[in-house]
């Protein structure tokens, strides 16, 4: 594997004209123009969606030396470079806007932004809020990332969720540090370095295994420190200035060294400078040791080890002269000098890609060697040219990559709710009624209870316990995502949306309880099924009560037809379920058309219900036909579930190996195989006759050998391939429907496309 495919070295004479002191070679991605285009696109998109003026004054990745993305991702091909640079700048913009708010406003915006990515969060998610606009913007770029590399894109989001502690833009108190190591432990999370490397992996299309990470761990330790502390070093003057002028927090390794070693600012900066040089030398020594100990080290690991060093050097070089870190000097109006009492550096080498300024340039006295070197942009006019004519504005106290990852972590941590394992809201206790009943019960003597003729409600603890349990289970949140995505077109007010979510969740969770009982299923989403904890009778009673609650919610809608809509779709749901149970009990395999009709009523009924309720509650007058889309999505969702149950390791973990076979379920792959292979009918009949059908007898799993044989038959007969091709046809039809509706409404819907892409069975 060639190490340097997408980058070129920076000339020594260019490096010497900057205050950069990195000892490592500096390279830049050959496609700096792609990175610049991505930055400008991020600015345009931000301005289009948010209209807050931030894009006009922001200083982000563009500089005369090159784009931050081109230095941070030197070995990333153009298509992926555009994605990661865009995300980096999007994060910087979000962080700037967030930091500019007062604390109360910032916290409100942060909560609402988080609510938009959590399908079961009950905070309002109004379309007009800043968070809602950001959600749509982020959904689009995440969709593009998944389309480029679905597996790596999803891995990146998963790692964000598992390895990143989101920074809430200044919320919380920064601890006092007793050592730089203690500070580093804090900053690894605050900075986002754990999430940055998955971003690099996505960019380089290089998935590191656990064994790979263990092998390169000695190298990554100094690299992590160098990236974080390099940013701290070059941003310290600006952050110090802002802490003096507006009281912003100062979280910086220079400040930590100054405090714990009782040094002056100049002494602390000199100490950090030496620490950075030492870290780079430590990286080189450990790199040589790894190569010596592993002469046959895989080529992809050798490339990774080389690239991370270049990333340190490149971001160091960029930060040494970037307008983001240095332009504040010329925008200051209070006369404060930089913390090191040195004038802003100026770079006199004209850029090949941007117009150079003929304005005045300042000279910098280098504190280390006494030489005078012209370095970085010195006046507002130059900065305007170097940043695509962006005017100066307030900057945050963080790092460009920390800022990028702050947004991405908040997005991916909550976007994961699109995909794997976010938990349902717990059903809310009706505390006032329950407390009243308890006090009423306890306040009576035994004799007065026997003589009392007044009626009162007992406590709801027993009734609610199974409900709380099923609602606590993790969920993919597909239906909640669809409600939010449909609302881009239907524009239902938040009050009605909250009721619709509540009603749909009640029905869905009630159906899960009953399905598990009817299917004799011992597990649900990797946990014991509700009836195995609370018993069949109590579980059924609570599920029935959830239907009562759903009717109560339906009566609260403005549209008087809501209850009728609910009852009609409940009838369809029960009709569909009746045939699913009938086929199983009588061991009669349906035809493919019969099966699809069952799906349209059972699975599609819930999708159709949420759509009809939204249409009934919408305020707009423009008619939007979404009926066909819900039918297609219901079929796609159910058939995909059938397919994955027999093919996916995740389903094995959560439900057991091929649990549909244990249940005796005539799922879509079984139905198709029976329709096309007569001999399979006898085989599957014989298999299913081995399982009990009486609800009291419980389910006895089929022998693993039998299930493996059935799966192998489905595979060799081409049934799985047929199912996958049918799912891809459904995907294409859904995409065509989305295209049609987007044209009719003139409203793009990246959230719905992102949801479909996540569920896709297409190969990457």
Curated annotation (Swiss-Prot):
Keywords: Isoprene biosynthesis, Lyase, Magnesium, Metal-binding, Multifunctional enzyme, Repeat, Transferase. Mg(2+) 1 binds at residue 95. In the N-terminal section; belongs to the terpene synthase family. In the C-terminal section; belongs to the FPP/GGPP synthase family. Coiled coil: none annotated. Residues 332-759 are annotated as: Prenyltransferase. Substrate binds at residues 95, 187-190, 231, 235-239, 324-325. This is Sesterfisherol synthase. Signal peptide: none annotated. Mg(2+) 4 binds at residues 515, 519. PANTHER family: GERANYLGERANYL PYROPHOSPHATE SYNTHASE, THIJ_PFPI FAMILY PROTEIN (AFU_ORTHOLOGUE AFUA_3G01210)-RELATED. Mg(2+) 2 binds at residue 95. It comes from Neosartorya fischeri (strain ATCC 1020 / DSM 3700 / CBS 544.65 / FGSC A1164 / JCM 1740 / NRRL 181 / WB 181). A motif (DDXXD 1) lies at residues 95-99. Bifunctional terpene synthase; part of the gene cluster that mediates the biosynthesis of sesterfisheric acid. The bifunctional terpene synthase NfSS converts dimethylallyl diphosphate (DMAPP) and isopentenyl diphosphate (IPP) into sesterfisherol. The C-terminal prenyltransferase (PT) domain of NfSS catalyzes formation of geranylfarnesyl pyrophosphate (GFPP), whereas the N-terminal terpene cyclase (TC) domain catalyzes the cyclization of GFPP to sesterfisherol. The cytochrome P450 monooxygenase NfP450 then catalyzes oxidative modifications of sesterfisherol into sesterfisheric acid. The conserved DDXXD motifs as well as the NSE/DTE motif are important for the catalytic activity, presumably through binding to Mg(2+). The lineage of its organism: Eukaryota, Fungi, Dikarya, Ascomycota, Pezizomycotina. Its cofactor is Mg(2+). Dimethylallyl diphosphate binds at residues 524, 602-603, 638, 645, 655, 665. Mg(2+) 3 binds at residues 515, 519. Changing residue 191 to A: Produces novel sesterterpenes, but not sesterfisherol. A motif (DDXXD 2) lies at residues 515-519. Hexamer. A motif (NSE/DTE) lies at residues 231-239. It catalyses: isopentenyl diphosphate + (2E,6E)-farnesyl diphosphate = (2E,6E,10E)-geranylgeranyl diphosphate + diphosphate; isopentenyl diphosphate + (2E,6E,10E)-geranylgeranyl diphosphate = (2E,6E,10E,14E)-geranylfarnesyl diphosphate + diphosphate; (2E,6E,10E,14E)-geranylfarnesyl diphosphate + H2O = sesterfisherol + diphosphate. Pathway: Secondary metabolite biosynthesis; terpenoid biosynthesis. Residues 348-358 have a biased composition (Polar residues).
